[in-house]
């Protein structure tokens, strides 16, 4: 299975989510940033992943499941802040959270 790294920028009323692929000790961007809840990040990411033939169906499902978990968690809280850091890192170990105030 390919290794992916999520980047989540936590803004005031939304999150921006992008996906990178881990290549040895470096990462390469797979997607641009998708904003939630401003747009349907899940649907946009799904369409983009479908257009990349090198991403297998099992990897696409894996990635979309993580995105679903991120979106659902954010929807419950309506925000992420630095006080959430320990729980977020435990729940989402492959996600890099960036806080912007």
From Swiss-Prot:
Query: What UniProt keywords apply to this chain's record, in alphabetical order?
Result: Chloroplast, Plastid, Ribonucleoprotein, Ribosomal protein
Query: What does the entry list under GO cellular component?
Result: chloroplast; ribonucleoprotein complex; ribosome
Main location group: plastid
Gene Ontology molecular functions: structural constituent of ribosome
Subcellular location(s) of the protein = Plastid, Chloroplast
Q: Does this entry carry the keyword Protein transport?
A: no
The UniProt entry's GO biological process terms, in alphabetical order, are:
translation
Q: Name one Pfam family in it.
A: PSRP-3_Ycf65
> What is known about what this protein does?
Probably a ribosomal protein or a ribosome-associated protein.
Tell me which family the UniProt entry assigns to this protein. Belongs to the chloroplast-specific ribosomal protein cS23 family.
Q: Which PANTHER family match?
A: 30S RIBOSOMAL PROTEIN 3, CHLOROPLASTIC (PTHR35108), OS04G0461100 PROTEIN (PTHR35108:SF1)
Assembly notes: Part of the 30S ribosomal subunit.
Q: What is this protein called?
A: Small ribosomal subunit protein cS23
Biological source species: Euglena myxocylindracea
């Amino acid at each position: 299975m390919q290794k992916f790294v999520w980047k989540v920028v936590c803004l005031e009323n939304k999150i921006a989510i992008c996906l990178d692929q881990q290549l040895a000790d470096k990462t390469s961007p797979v997607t641009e940033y998708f904003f939630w809840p401003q747009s349907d990040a899940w649907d946009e990411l799904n369409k983009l992943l479908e257009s990349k033939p090198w991403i297998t169906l099992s990897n696409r499902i894996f990635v979309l499941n993580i995105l679903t978990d991120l979106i659902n968690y954010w929807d419950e809280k309506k925000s992420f802040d630095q006080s959430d850091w320990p729980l977020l890192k435990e729940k989402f170990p492959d996600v890099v959270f960036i806080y912007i105030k």
